[in-house]
Amino acid sequence: RGEEVESIAVMEQFKSGRPLLLVLPGSHNKFVSVDAEGKMTGCLTSISGELLASITNDTIIAKSVGKQFVEEETYDREWLLKGYDNAKRTGLGRTCFTARILQLFYEDAPPKIANFVLGAALQGDVTAVLHSDALKVSPDTTVVVGGKNPLRQAIVDILEHEGYFARIETYVPEEGISLSALGAYLVAEKNGIL
């Protein structure tokens, strides 16, 4: 499967002898736990990217965010964490409606509201990771976040804000090399196909 092959590419770069949590964000955010010996011990996938797309384009919130996703130049850590914290207290649905209220009566800036909604959409993933029976993680687990900005940075900022994991790192592959291709190459090489 895709996330496992992508994970192999990331694992090749992080042979630390410590347990890892690989975070591969996208329309389906993928979380893969790896033990200290480098074996995958669990996977968790969410549809938070799809939920964010639906909220941004197909709900009453679409106007509040200008039907725009957060871009690198509009990324706002403060508003992201406000959305995250609000969703942690009141849930995704209520937080999204709060975004509309904020836009109408407090801050008529769609990029800020989009960051607020992004934080809310990602909150459930953090709860899932921390309480999952599928993943094996502890505060000593090194988190490696891949993907593209601003999503990569948003996840790093949220995990640092949450404070559970002691080490959070990012992984950016070389220009022009996809994680899937690199992982498939490594699998083929290990199995003597290449």
Placement of each model-derived feature along the sequence:
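Glycine-rich phosphate-binding/hydrolytic loop that grips phosphoryl groups
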Residues: T170-L194
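Gly/Ser/Thr-rich loops at beta-strand to alpha-helix junctions
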Residues: L24-K30, K148-R152
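Phosphate/pyrophosphate-binding loops at sites that engage ATP/ADP/AMP, CoA/4′-phosphopantetheine
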Residues: V126-P139
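Short glycine-aspartate micro-motif
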Residues: L20-L24, V144
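Adenine-nucleotide phosphate-binding core of ATP-dependent small-molecule kinases
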Residues: D85-A128
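Glycine-rich phosphate-binding loop plus the immediately following alpha-helix
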Residues: R1-L21, K30-N86
